[in-house]
């Protein structure tokens, strides 16, 4: 499902910075790729997930929560770290 996400503000949680991926690199993926809806089994909410290659060629996985005021990025990680 395609989303036109254009909140006035994009915020990052501290845990989203755990893998030391810069905000600019994450923002590039958010702008260039379409998100997929994913179900959070812990909260029961629908989140958005992006998988895309940043401006330096690193494939990233990004997960965000949509609120009425802003997009809250809660997870940014190199996709190769994902357990198979």
Which stretches of residues belong to each language-model region?
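Ribonuclease/tRNase effector modules and their secretory precursors
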Residues: 1-84
């Amino acid at each position: 499902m395609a989303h036109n996400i254009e909140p006035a503000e994009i915020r990052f949680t501290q845990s989203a910075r755990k893998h030391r991926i810069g905000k600019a690199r994450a923002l590039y993926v958010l702008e260039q790729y379409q998100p997929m809806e994913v179900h959070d089994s812990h909260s029961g909410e629908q989140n958005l997930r992006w998988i895309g290659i940043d401006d330096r060629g690193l494939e990233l996985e990004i997960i965000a929560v949509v609120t009425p005021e802003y997009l809250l990025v809660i997870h940014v990680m190199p996709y190769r770290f994902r357990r198979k």
